[in-house]
Structure formats: C-alpha cells, structure tokens
Amino acid sequence: MGFLSKIADGNKKEIKRLGKLADKVLALEEDMSILTDEEIKAKTSAFQEKLQSEEDIKKQNKILDDILPEAFALVREGSKRVFNMIPYKVQVMGGIAIHGGDISEMRTGEGKTLTATMPVYLNALTGRGVHVITVNEYLSSVQSQEMAELYEFLGLSVGLNLNSKTTTEKREAYACDITYCTNNELGFDYLRDNMVNYAEERVMRPLNFAIIDEVDSILIDEARTPLIISGEAEKSTSLYTQANVFAKMLKSEDDYNYDEKTKAVQLTEQGIDKAERMFKIDNLYDVNNVDVISHINTALRAHVTLQRDVDYMVNKGEVLIVDQFTGRTMPGRRFSEGLHQAIEAKEGVKIQNESKTMASITFQNYFRMYNKLSGMTGTAKTEEEEFRNIYNMTVTQIPTNKPVQRVDKPDLIYISQKGKFDAVVQDVIEKHKAGQPVLLGTVAVETSEYISNLLKKNGVRHDVLNAKNHEREADIVAGAGQRGAVTIATNMAGRGTDIKLGDGVQELGGLAVIGTERHESRRIDDQLRGRSGRQGDKGDSRFYLSLQDELMVRFGSERLQNMMNRLGMDDSTPIESKMVSRAVESAQKRVEGNNFDARKRVLEYDDVLRKQREIIYGERNSIIDSDESGGLVNDMLRSTLERSVNYYVNEEADDPDYEPFINYVDDVFLNEGDIKVEDIKGKDNEDIFEFVWNKVEIALKDQKEKIGTQFDEFERMILLRSIDTHWTDHIDTMDQLRQGIHLRSYGQQNPLRDYQNEGHQLFDTMMQNIEEDVSKYILKSVVSVEDDLERDKTTDFGKAEHVSAEDGKEKAKAEPYVKDEHIGRNDPCPCGSGKKYKNCHGA
C-alpha cells in the first residue's frame, strides 16, 4: 500500500471514530433541550469545579475527554437558543478532531466558526485559557463579538486582544476564559512579556490551548517570517544608493546571470570588474569588502527578482510588501537583511535606517510552546507531512454536510499570455450575458488591472479586489454571488467572507470561478476553487494557463511548446489534456517541496536560538518572580573570580606574573591596593581564590550596608540590565553569523553544524560577559540609590497603571515591529519600561 493510500485509509478510520463519538453527542440533544437557561449555566459551573479541583494537566485532559459528549451537547443547545442554529453532525466531528489537537479540514461554507465553539467551550472549562487565533484583527473583532453572546450565555468570559489595546486592557483580555487575537499580536505580546522589569507588567498567562483559523496560512505560509522587535542601528544608508546606481547600469547575461527556477542572481566576471572599478577596490571578494558585495547582491535582488505591484507596492512614498498568498499589502512589515532599503533606493523614496534586533521568534517555535495546538482550514491535506513533522498534528478531512455539486473543469493551456487572456475575456462575456456570476482569480495586482482594462474595453461592468483597494473588500465579496456580477480578485486566500448566491443564480449554474494562472501552491488554487459550490450550491471552476506563465517558465514548458508547435497549433487554440494538468501539478509539488525544505532549514537554525532564548527568558523570569537574587549574584561573583584566577595565574610557572590578575581584580571586584603581590605570591590557585573571595565578601557586605533595604531591588536591576544588554548584542551577532554561514558549504563544511557550534561558543561567552558585568556593577557602582531606583520603579508603574499628570491617560504601549522596522532613539523603548529607547535597550 502506498503512502497516500495509507493516509486515505487512516482518514476513513478517523472519520468512523469521530462519527461514533458525534452520535453520542447528538443522542443527548433531547436531555439538553429540557434544561432551563440557569441549569445550563449551572452545568458549566459544575464542569469547572470538577476540572479546576485537579491540578495535573494529564488528569485534566482525561476528564475533558470523559465530559466531551455532554459539554458538546450543551454548546449545541446553547447555539440553538442564542443563534437559532444547531451544529450538524459533521461540525461536531470537526470539533472533536480540534479538541484532539489536530486540524479539521472543512470546505468553505461548512461553518468552521460554529464548529470551533464546541472545543473552545470544553477546553476553556479548565480555567487555563483558550486562544482563538485569526489572520487579521477584523476577523478577531467580528468573531469575538458574534460568539461572545453564546459563550456568555453558557457562563464563560470572552476577551478581545488588539494591537491598539493598552497594557491593562490586554491583561484583562488574556485573563478571560476565551481570548480572540491575531497570530502577530500573540507573538509580540510573548516577546514583550519577556522584556519587562516587573512581574505585574506581564499581560499573558502560560500558554495552554490554541485554535488557529486558516491554520495553513499561519503555520505554513507565514512560518518563515520571524516576529521581531527591533531598535535603530544608526548605520549609513549611502551604500544602498551607490549599489542602486550600480545595479541600474548592469545588463543581463553580460554583467549578471539570473536563474528563474531558483531566483538566484550572480555577477559575471565582467560584472565583478565593473563593481571593482565603480567602488574603487582591488578585489570585490576581499574580506574587507563584505559590506560592498552584500549591498550589491541586495540591490541586484531588488532590481531583478522583485517586481513593483507584484511583490511590493509604493504608496505615499512608502514601500509596502504584498503578501503573495493573500494579495493584501502588509503595512508595518519590512523585508529583512537590507532588501527593503534596496527597494527604497530603487524606487527613489526615503531610505529608512537599518535596525538592530532586540527580541525575535518564529511562528513555528512560538506555537510549539502551547500545551495543545489545533486548527481548521479549507485546505491542509497537501501539507499534511509538514504539519505532522513540525507540529505533530494530523489533518482530518471532514465530510461536507451536503454533497459538493461544483464541477472542476480541466485546465486550458495556450501558447501565449495574450491568447490566454483573450479566451478568458470571451468566457467572461458569455457567462455575463447569461447572468451567471463570475469570480476571476489572479496571482498579481498587475494581472488584475490588465484584465480589468480588457473587460472595460468590452463594456463588462466589474469589481476589482486587490491590495490597492482592500478597504472595500467586504462589500465586493458580499456582492460577488449576485446575478451578473463579475469580480476580479488577487489571491482569494484568507478572505474571511463567504460568497453567497443571489436569487436565481442556482438555475444559471451557480458561481463560475476562473483562474488566470496556477499559483505555486496547490492550496491557493484549491482555495480559489472552494469559493464556489459552498453548502451544496452549484458552481464550476476552470484554470486558463499559458506557456509564458511564471510556473510554466520555471518548470519545463519547453516540451509542451515543442509539442504545440509540431501540432501546428495557433494562439487561439488551447490544449485540454490530463498530461498538461499533471505537468502543472508536478511543478507545484516541486515548488512545495522546495518551500518545505526551506521552512525546515529555518526551523533547524532557529532551534539553536530557541534553546538559548529559553535559558535567557527563564533566567529573567526567575529574577523577576523571586523575592531576592542574592544567591544568583553570589554564584556569578564566584564563577567570574574562579575563571579569572585560572586565566591569569599560571600556577605551573616557576615565577608567575601576578600583575595582570591584580589589575583585573582591581577593575572588577575590589579597590586598588586591596590586594598586593605579596598577599598571593607562592599560593596555589585554590588558595588565591579563597583569599580574594574573603575580601569580595567583605566588599559585598559593605555595599549592602551602604544601599540598605533597597539592595535586593538594586541587584535585580543590575541583573536585568546586564542580561538585556548582552542578549540584544548576542541576537545581532547570531544574525550576522547566520547570514554569512552558508558560504561555508563552498569549503566542504556543514553550515548548520558550524552555526550550532559557533552559536554555542558565542552563547557561553555572552553568559561569561553577563557574569563579569554583574560582578563589576554590584561591587563598583556608586549610586544615589533612592533617586535611581525610584526613577526605575516610577516609570515602570507609570507604564502599567500610573495616571500621568500631563494627560490623565495611561501611557500607550510601544508598538511592535517586524524585521527591519525600527525604533527611533527618542521613541519609547518597546520593553515597556516607559524610558526612551536610547536610555534603555538602546543604551
């Protein structure tokens, strides 16, 4: 039996199991219908009491499984009373799969939002919190508002967490039984919680259970995008301008080679000569010219591989990334590694400064921290291997409530794009005349505008939905199923609104979906098709392709071109064959395989930083949560002193030189003259350590007496500042190491192993530097304690809850940023301290 057959067979078994359990839920319908509203709330309280009296998570999970039929039946009854809707059996099955920590694949229009209410309610009973995660704040707001009515009727609290919320509002939202939020905001709140100086500034509780709507979009499409909080690095932008001027001068093939399959750009020998002349250097690849070659490569990528209105747009002097999967612009997001600055130079807009990373995490590593993770989507089966390998989740295809009536017609392939678009327009005109609504899917903004112009010339009224006019999205989608409607949409993925058919449209054949190009991901094609034929409606879909489409050019359209030429086919005659569809699907699988490998690689590298992040965040949290930090400081002092003795004093030598050691002790631990050469001469290292340690203990005692009752607070402040300063520098160093490590493969080395080894060494060095800094500041600081500590505490409390005398409002929290968005030197520090960035993490 092949791998796919096993999966299909496994899905059948799982559906059978889910069906039996769903029948138990449905069997309780009558029992629930006789309960009063008060009795329903009382059931919730009884469930909560039973679960919350048990602290062990494994035992709690066992109780959850036991009460599932009754809890799900209660939600069905609540839904009937609140919404006048009762979840179907297939929705109950989907809910059971979600509760099991898996992914429910449910077709468009099958009611995923209502399906989620059952596992959300069940898991919220533990009191540990449930996060319902959506791809944008609009969906979070709408869903939380609609579903709060049901959850509150059942006796649970619901919170909504948005980027605009204050710290106090966020804390209240996370304290609720159920919290609606976007994936971005969750990640940023997690990072910010690990940058605070006081426990009361945290907003989140420990991560428990998450249900991700459009799970493939978040865990697959966005997996490679790290969430990053960054500060300004204050580097010059002049090299970007010079590299841009240079890139404009170059000619393809003469000066550089471009591989369309891998999208790699490389200078030729002639290009290298030109670079050396322009930048007035002898050898471009000299180690001192790393910055120059890096900027040239980035400028080439900006000019050759990225296209305006396809990969990014320029709006009001700002470069905005276009999401390749949804067609939306992503304000606030920036390309990393200087690419955004290179595009700004290319487009002649203001070049923003580069940034320095202060905290970062990928979605892959963030979501793996939950006790239980689950999701739902219309399309996930094609990525099942990735879900299983990385997140330990299986995909269960839930049957539809009514049979699917949509007809998916074979692809039509033309020699040129002109022939293809002419045929598309002709098809639209015919369907429009008959009154059948048409949804045209494109993969780029410029394609949607090109087709729009063709339709205008032919007098066909239509709406365009792309990154340039997403404000009208809900209105356009709502009208797309009406009689005679023609809608052009760039990548329909992630559009959270169903297309409902107008009166008389069923008789005309339902919604017709026309794809103008295959996306490199089969999921996006399936999502476009899935907009038609919802809930048993009629509909049809067809893709029009050409040999000039990007996917065909990248993956072997030459054979097809030769075949069409041999057959003497002209531009207006398409091929309709299974061989073509198979070739396209094969190309898509190759791209998906490449993308999966790339995401796995990102995870392998990020895992190095993940382990280090866990150590640092664990250390910070124990400092913040403990009443005193004296034990940790003592350990750091001993460790630093021990290392310095072994480093500076060679006890094997006949006449060791003690001066370097004494200078070090004077600098870090004691005052000048506290120890002399004769005090330690002739002693072995162990005795030297004990002698100096006795003096360090006396110095520490003196410092405690000077500072008094505030000493614990002083220790904690020194510890946190030292950790934060060195950790920020370490992240930046690791980032630089990562960017250059792939070049090691040319020297027959394993880049990942080198990154792991060197990353480990860098981390050890960082920890030693933290210990040395803490030792020095604890013993050597001369502080006006009341002023310094009072200032630190006042701004902290002011950040969280203090009412400012200036405006009577709570201070706004620092905004999060994704890669390369920067924080100005005088802006509030995003760690939440309330200080300016330059006086805090930017110091």
Curated annotation (Swiss-Prot):
Please give the cofactor(s) recorded in the UniProt entry for this protein.
Answer: Zn(2+)
Q: Which UniProt keywords apply?
A: ATP-binding, Cell membrane, Cytoplasm, Membrane, Metal-binding, Nucleotide-binding, Protein transport, Translocase, Translocation, Transport, Zinc
Q: Which residues bind ATP?
A: Q91, G109, E110, G111, K112, T113, D498
Q: What is its EC number?
A: 7.4.2.8
Gene Ontology CC: cell envelope Sec protein transport complex; cytosol; plasma membrane
Q: Write down the superkingdom of origin.
A: Bacteria
SUPFAM superfamilies reported in the protein's UniProt record: Helical scaffold and wing domains of SecA, P-loop containing nucleoside triphosphate hydrolases, Pre-protein crosslinking domain of SecA
Q: Where is the composition biased (Basic and acidic residues)?
A: 796-825
Q: Which is an annotated GO molecular function term of this record? A: protein-exporting ATPase activity
The top EC class, named as a word, is translocase
Q: How is the cofactor bound?
A: May bind 1 zinc ion per subunit.
InterPro entries per record: Helicase_ATP-bd, Helicase_C-like, P-loop_NTPase, SEC_C_motif, SecA, SecA_CS, SecA_DEAD, SecA_motor_DEAD
What biological-process GO terms show up in the record? intracellular protein transmembrane transport; protein import; protein targeting; protein transport by the Sec complex
- Membrane topology per record: Peripheral membrane protein
Record region (Disordered):
796-833
Q: Where in the cell is it found?
A: Cell membrane; Cytoplasm
Name the catalysed reactions. ATP + H2O + cellular proteinSide 1 = ADP + phosphate + cellular proteinSide 2
Q: What is its main location?
A: membrane
Q: Which residues bind Zn(2+)?
A: C829, C831, C840, H841
Q: What does this protein do?
A: Part of the Sec protein translocase complex. Interacts with the SecYEG preprotein conducting channel. Has a central role in coupling the hydrolysis of ATP to the transfer of proteins into and across the cell membrane, serving as an ATP-driven molecular motor driving the stepwise translocation of polypeptide chains across the membrane.
The record's family statement is: Belongs to the SecA family.
Q: What NCBIfam families does UniProt report for this protein, alphabetically? A: PRK09200.1, secA
Subunit record text: Monomer and homodimer. Part of the essential Sec protein translocation apparatus which comprises SecA, SecYEG and auxiliary proteins SecDF. Other proteins may also be involved.
Entry protein name: Protein translocase subunit SecA
Organism classification: Bacteria, Bacillati, Bacillota, Bacilli, Bacillales
